[in-house]
Amino acid sequence: MALRLLRLVPASAPARGLAAGAQRVGRIHTSVHCKLRYGLLAAILGDKTTKKLHEYSRVITVDGNICSGKNKLAKEIAQQLGMKHYPEAGIQYSSTTTGDGRPLDIEFSGSCSLEKFYDDPKSNDGNSYRLQSWLYASRLLQYADALEHLLSTGQGVVLERSIYSDFVFLEAMYNQGYIRKQCVDHYNEIKRLTLPEYLPPHAVIYIDVPVPEVQSRIQKKGDPHEMKVTSAYLQDIENAYKKTFLPKMSEMCEVLVYDSWEAEDPTKVVEDIEYLKYNKGPWLKQDDWTFHYLRMLVQDKTEVLNYTTIPVYLPEITIGAHQGSRIYNSFRELPGRKYAPGYNAEVGDKWIWLK
């Protein structure tokens, strides 16, 4: 029930601006992006996705363990290739990309806490799986936003982790006894229903940082909650990446692996990206009509999140009807959340009567 709150997001989250310092602006659609929803009529009248795509119209994800340097490398890649950078989707992704953009109370954001997970990963209130379920839905929403941006503008995107790598945390949680087998089954069912609807990244970049070095970086970072992460949990994340994620992704997209010191040279990474052939994976089989159906899906965020809620009773993510109704009504009272985007006068929307 708690996950149903994610479906409160508006049906369309418009793409944000270009990456700062883009070097290849001549290759990118840079006009003001129309906020009218794309549809069948637009496709018939000539809004063809293939006309917008070029050699840098790619989806690139940067993966790695905690504190592996994903953010820094992803930003550098996006800047040098003129792509849009998407920082890692967190608990507040849906709230910060919709409404007035302000983070919401935990009650409206999955009723979960990353800090609590670090402090007490075996908490008997179900926080660990509630967190993982919410983060998967947040990554799903972000991946849809990224695809919508690419297919609408032709500008490539760089993400930190994605729906394809999210499972590494689930496996680590289960191996460490943080969640039950029923939670794993529930997660895998949602993944089975949602993942096939999307196209995988064109390229995955994995930063391989040994667990001892990861722990050293965590200690240096100084987050009192994150510092409680065990080496066993970090090792399970690494194992899931290397034994499952990378082999599977290598079948459908390009994979580049770098040691921590190699990842410190983004120019070399960008050179490697430009030499990739991109000669495998489902992107090669797409045409304007398959792109049309994908665009119709990713712009409809309610549909994107539809199968993140399935009729299965799981105590970790289930709340009562009265509590759910109270939370829903409270959510609608928040600024910019009562009506669809553009129709909320309290957040400055104008000319509502003409829309």
Curated annotation (Swiss-Prot):
Pfam families: dNK (PF01712). CDD domains: NDUO42. One of its GO terms (cellular component) is mitochondrial inner membrane. The modification N6-succinyllysine is found at residues 122, 285. Binds 1 FAD per subunit. Residues 1-35 form a transit peptide. It is found in: Mitochondrion matrix. GO terms for molecular function: NADH dehydrogenase (ubiquinone) activity. The keyword DNA damage does not apply. GO terms for biological process: aerobic respiration; mitochondrial electron transport, NADH to ubiquinone; proton motive force-driven mitochondrial ATP synthesis. Keywords: Acetylation, Electron transport, FAD, Flavoprotein, Mitochondrion, Phosphoprotein, Respiratory chain, Transit peptide, Transport. Changing residue 250 to D: Phosphomimetic mutant; able to rescue mitochondrial depolarization in a Pink1 mutant background. PANTHER family: DEOXYNUCLEOSIDE KINASE, NADH DEHYDROGENASE [UBIQUINONE] 1 ALPHA SUBCOMPLEX SUBUNIT 10, MITOCHONDRIAL. Accessory subunit of the mitochondrial membrane respiratory chain NADH dehydrogenase (Complex I), that is believed not to be involved in catalysis. Complex I functions in the transfer of electrons from NADH to the respiratory chain. The immediate electron acceptor for the enzyme is believed to be ubiquinone. Complex I is composed of 45 different subunits. This a component of the hydrophobic protein fraction. This is NADH dehydrogenase [ubiquinone] 1 alpha subcomplex subunit 10, mitochondrial.
